[in-house]
């Protein structure tokens, strides 16, 4: 940081994440966007105008930005398969890193980043926003002392029609399909909320391409270390967004439900089948930039860590392998 305590952030990519989270850094009193790397000239200029970045700090190559600018942190908001190289480059330059999900689309890459960060004083936060959502925080607290043993989770979206011509349906950039995109948030939500360690995965997928790389629908069965199971369903070929997660233990359940991207509702169910709706103040939710800056200042773990993201990549990669082979796939995180 500068002497004034301002975090100098360089943006890599100015798509949705780059502009939204970049805007959070721009608006925060303790951070500023000082440089931008974007291959699209029009988007680069638009972002520069929005964030008041001078021409001499605009780049079409992120490596040139890292070499040429005095930065404290980078925001990686590029297509999924590019994350690994850009994250590693940022760490090599001694920077803190905010990376959109997923952390990586290769399990060995995710392991490498996790090992690297956990042995350093650099902060890496992954953009899984459920970790900041009071509904999911409430559910996670419910299972701190009694782990769930039966989980169901599903999310639907008009993903295929919406992104048919976008990088998200190009597996060379996305790493896969619906499961690696919107589905990644669902997997992260159930893994983080439950606190369980996955051990094996079985999956069946419907692919939208002849090469069987871009899934439009997936059914994923997960086994956990404590014997619990999860049944996860994602569909990107339906008309709207709905999300439902149900986690059961011997005392009852927690249900998290919502539509589109509005705040989620959490409901607790006791052993007598009585529903309770705990008070959840969504106004207290901090944004991603705020959480990232706080973690750096306090030298504390960010809300969504590299190890959290490693679990998601492990389950996701196992699901694709299982869908292609028809076999259960064991998961090894280390």
Regions found by a protein language model. Give the residues of each.
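Beta-loop-alpha module in the N-terminal Rossmann-like domain of NAD(P)-dependent dehydrogenases
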Residues: 21, 57-116
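NAD(P)-dinucleotide binding in Rossmann-like oxidoreductases
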Residues: 213-215, 225-287
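Predominantly a Rossmann-like dinucleotide-binding segment in NAD(P)-dependent oxidoreductases
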Residues: 130-210, 326
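Basic phosphate/pyrophosphate-binding loop/patch that engages nucleotide-derived ligands
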Residues: 115-123, 134-150, 222-224, 249
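Hydrophobic residues in well-ordered beta-strands that form the structural core
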Residues: 60, 98-99, 124-126, 256
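C-terminal helix-rich "cap/oligomerization" subdomain common to oxidoreductases
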Residues: 1-3, 42, 64, 73-75, ...
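N-terminal Rossmann-like dinucleotide-binding module
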Residues: 1-52
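Haloarchaeal acidic low-complexity proteome signature biased toward cell-envelope/secretome components but also
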Residues: 1-9, 16-19, 30, 106, ...
